[in-house]
């Protein structure tokens, strides 16, 4: 289905470094990056351009736009989001979506990788000591920083700082004009090796999912599409909100398969039961 075809990677931040090698090796495709393709048009981490769509729809739009400008019918794009972990609210997380779209075969395969392995952070600093402390905690200079100064109407943003001399000199200049400076981690992939590692894990997940084919029609990407609650409480037997089954669906033929007790648990702790612990 994929072997011998061209595949465009929708990126301007060097994600092809971790996407292309395994994808080419496993799928037998020829990966390339669209020239002068500006993914900042879909939103920036530094805030100048707001992301207007959901992360998934943004990744889809990247794919379709890259396919349009390159006349290619196979694309991959990723979209990252940074903030509190969905279940560990006080822990920052990198939430990466990776999407493969095959227009020729009308196929879309999506994977998600959520990781607490991130240096995502920002701080308002007013002294060189605070600046250096933040930079060291953020793994600078191997990981880039962003410096913001000025108000909303005249804000100056310097991205991709990965040199101590540039960081300190820029701070010295700006702190003479403003009481404080906002310093942030640069989360763009080419400035953040830790994020690249998370994207690499998402690529491994994507390949794993592609290799799972529908048992009926053989279409790649046969994976979990839904979950069914109702794992019984070990004390009272009442159905809990925990997962009882995973449901996998084929995009092509619609074949479904239900896997009961997907986590190897046949019952749930009473602390998660609305009957025992309302």
Regions found by a protein language model. Give the residues of each.
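Compact, glycine/acidic-enriched structural inserts
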Residues: 107-144
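N-terminal glycine-rich phosphate/adenylate-binding segment common to multiple enzyme folds
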Residues: 62, 67-102
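N-terminal segment of the mature soluble domain
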Residues: 20-41
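N-terminal beta1-alpha1 ligand-phosphate binding loop
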Residues: 2-23
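Cys/His-rich short segments
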Residues: 201-278
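Fold-independent oxyanion-binding glycine-rich loops
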Residues: 11-12, 78-81, 103-104, 112-114, ...
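Active-site rim beta-loop-alpha module in soluble metabolic enzymes
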Residues: 135-203, 208-213
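N-terminal beta-loop-helix "entrance" segment that forms/cooperates
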Residues: 37-58
């Amino acid at each position: 289905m994929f072997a011998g075809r061209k595949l465009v990677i929708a990126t301007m931040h060097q994600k092809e470094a971790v996407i292309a090698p395994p994808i080419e090796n496993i799928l037998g495709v020829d990966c390339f990056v669209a020239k002068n393709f500006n993914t900042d048009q879909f939103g920036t981490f530094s805030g100048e351009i707001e992301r207007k769509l959901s992360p998934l729809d943004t990744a889809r739009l990247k794919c379709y736009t890259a396919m349009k400008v390159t006349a290619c019918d196979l694309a991959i794009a990723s979209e990252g989001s940074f903030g509190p972990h969905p279940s560990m609210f006080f822990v920052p997380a990198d939430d990466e979506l990776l999407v493969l779209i095959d227009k020729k075969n009308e196929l879309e395969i999506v994977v998600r990788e959520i990781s607490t392995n991130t240096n995502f952070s920002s701080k308002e600093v007013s002294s060189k000591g605070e600046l250096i402390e933040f930079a060291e905690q953020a793994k600078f200079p191997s990981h880039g920083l962003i410096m913001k100064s000025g108000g909303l109407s005249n804000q100056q943003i310097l991205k991709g700082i990965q040199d101590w001399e540039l960081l300190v000199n820029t701070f010295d200049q700006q702190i003479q004009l403003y009481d404080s400076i906002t310093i942030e981690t640069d989360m763009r992939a080419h400035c953040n090796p830790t994020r690249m590692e998370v994207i690499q894990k998402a690529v491994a997940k994507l390949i794993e999912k592609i290799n799972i084919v529908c048992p009926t029609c053989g279409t790649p990407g046969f994976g979990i599409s839904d979950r069914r609650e109702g794992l019984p409480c070990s004390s009272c037997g009442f159905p809990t909100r925990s997962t009882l089954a995973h449901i996998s669906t084929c995009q092509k033929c619609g074949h479904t398969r239900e896997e009961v007790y997907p986590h190897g648990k046949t019952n749930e702790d009473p602390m998660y039961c609305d009957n025992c612990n309302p």
